[in-house]
Design a protein with these regions (language model features):
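Conserved N-terminal alpha-helix of the aminotransferase class I/II PLP-enzyme fold
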Residues: 1-42, 56, 66-72, 78-80, ...
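PLP-dependent aminotransferase-like
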Residues: 55-112
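Conserved C-terminal alpha-helix-loop-beta "cap" of PLP-dependent enzymes
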Residues: 58, 250-335
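Hydrophobic beta-strand scaffold residues
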Residues: 86-87, 145-147, 289
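Distinct, well-ordered alpha-helical segments
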Residues: 102, 156-164
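Active-site C-terminal subdomain of aminotransferase-like
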Residues: 120, 125, 168-260, 269
C-alpha cells in the first residue's frame, strides 16, 4: 500500500475530502450509472441511512425486507432500536422475492431492499426479467428500491450484464470493498446527488465521518479493476465445479445451477460431524474444505458455504477431485 501511494502521489483525505476519495467515488458511480457516491466506513451504516432517508422522503416508515436480509440477521435490530424504520417481511425465506410478493404486502411501503446475490440462500439471483418487473413496479408505485450490493460484482457476472445494467432501476445501491475486492473494509452508498448529500449529513450524525478514509480507500482502489476483471473467471470456474459435483450425489448444491461464484453445499451429516471431518481432512491431507457447517432444517443434514475465488482457481483440477473424493468417502464412512 505504501509503495502504491508513493507511486501515485496519494495524499491523505481530511474527513473524506481528498483527491483519491473523490476520484474513487466518481469512478464507482460512473461504473454503476449513478449520479453520486459517498465512501462509508461500514455497510451497516450505509444501508440503514439509505432506507431511513427513503422513508423520510415519503412520510412512510415501512420497508420491505426479505427474511434473510443482513439487516435482520446480522445487525442487532439496529433499524428498530435506533428508530430508523419499520420492517415488513417479503417473500419465501428460501427463494428470491418477486413482484407478486411485493404486491401481496397489501399496504403502502416507502422502500424495498433487494440483495444481489442473496448470500444466505446460496447466492441466488432472481431471474433477469423478474428483477426488471420489480424495478418497473417500484418506479410506478413510488417505492424506493435499494440494492444490498455487497457482492453485486458477482451478480453482474452471473447475469452476464454490466454493473450499470444491474444497477439501473435502483434508487440507491450499497457496495462493499472487502467482500470480493479484498480491501481493508469500507463501503460506498450510491444514488442521486441530492440523496447522497442528505446521506452525508446522516452519516456525520451517526459518527461515520471519520478523520481519515484514505487507508481504506487505497486498499480497495489499488486492486479494484484487477479484482473486477477476475470475476468472470471465478464464475467460469464455478460452472466447472457444478459439472464436477454431478458425480457426487452426496453433495447437493444450492442453487441447483450456478447463479454466481457463491454456493451452499448440503451434506447428509449433522454439523458437528461435518466440522469434525473438515478438521481431520485438514490435518491428514492439508486441505481446508470449508469454514463452518451449520445444521439444516432436516435432522442429520447440514450445509456450508463455498466461495469460488483465487484458491479454487489455483488448485489443479485433480486436486479438487481429490478433495471431493476424500469428503465423499468420509461422509459414507460416517453414515455406517
Amino acid at each position: 500500500m505504501a509503495q502504491w501511494c508513493a507511486d501515485h502521489q496519494i495524499a491523505h483525505d481530511v474527513y473524506g475530502e481528498g483527491a483519491l476519495v473523490q476520484q474513487f467515488e466518481k469512478q464507482v458511480a460512473t461504473m454503476l450509472g449513478m449520479e453520486a457516491a459517498v465512501f462509508c466506513i461500514t455497510g451497516t451504516m450505509a444501508q440503514a441511512t439509505a432506507l431511513r432517508l427513503a422513508c423520510a422522503g415519503r412520510s412512510n416508515r415501512r420497508v420491505a425486507l426479505h427474511p434473510t436480509s443482513h439487516i435482520l440477521k446480522h445487525e442487532r435490530s439496529n433499524f428498530q432500536l435506533l428508530d430508523h424504520f419499520h420492517v415488513l417481511h417479503i417473500g419465501d425465506p428460501f427463494r428470491p422475492w418477486t413482484v407478486d410478493d411485493l404486491k401481496a404486502l397489501g399496504e403502502p411501503i416507502a422502500a424495498a431492499q433487494y440483495e444481489l446475490p442473496m448470500r444466505e440462500i446460496g447466492g441466488q439471483l432472481p431471474a433477469w426479467d423478474a428483477l426488471n418487473a420489480i424495478k418497473t413496479y417500484c418506479r410506478e408505485q413510488n417505492i424506493h428500491l435499494h440494492m444490498d450490493g455487497a457482492r453485486m460484482w458477482e451478480a453482474a457476472c452471473g447475469y452476464g450484464k454490466s454493473l450499470q445494467d444491474v444497477a439501473t432501476g435502483f434508487d440507491s445501491v450499497y457496495v462493499s470493498f472487502y467482500k470480493d475486492i479484498g480491501g481493508m473494509g469500507g463501503s460506498m452508498l450510491l444514488g442521486s446527488a441530492r440523496f447522497i448529500a442528505e446521506a452525508k449529513i446522516w452519516m456525520q450524525r451517526q459518527g461515520g465521518n471519520v478523520f481519515r478514509r484514505t487507508p481504506y480507500v487505497v486498499s480497495a482502489a489499488m486492486q479494484f479493476e484487477k479484482r473486477l476483471a477476475e470475476m468472470p473467471t471465478y464464475f467460469q470456474r464455478t460452472v466447472w465445479l457444478y459439472e464436477l459435483l454431478k458425480t457426487y450425489p452426496q453433495l447437493t448444491p444450492n442453487p441447483a445451477t450456478p447463479h454466481t461464484n457463491l454456493l451452499h453445499l448440503y451434506v447428509p451429516l449433522a454439523a458437528e460431524t461435518a466440522n469434525g471431518i473438515r478438521n481431520r481432512i485438514a490435518k491428514e491431507h492439508g486441505i481446508w474444505l470449508f469454514g463452518r457447517a451449520v445444521n439444516a432444517a432436516l435432522p442429520g443434514q447440514c450445509m456450508f458455504e463455498w466461495y469460488v475465488g483465487d484458491q479454487l482457481l489455483q488448485m489443479p483440477d485433480d486436486g479438487v477431485r481429490k478433495a471431493l473424493d476424500v469428503l465423499a468417502k468420509s461422509i459414507a464412512a460416517s453414515a455406517k
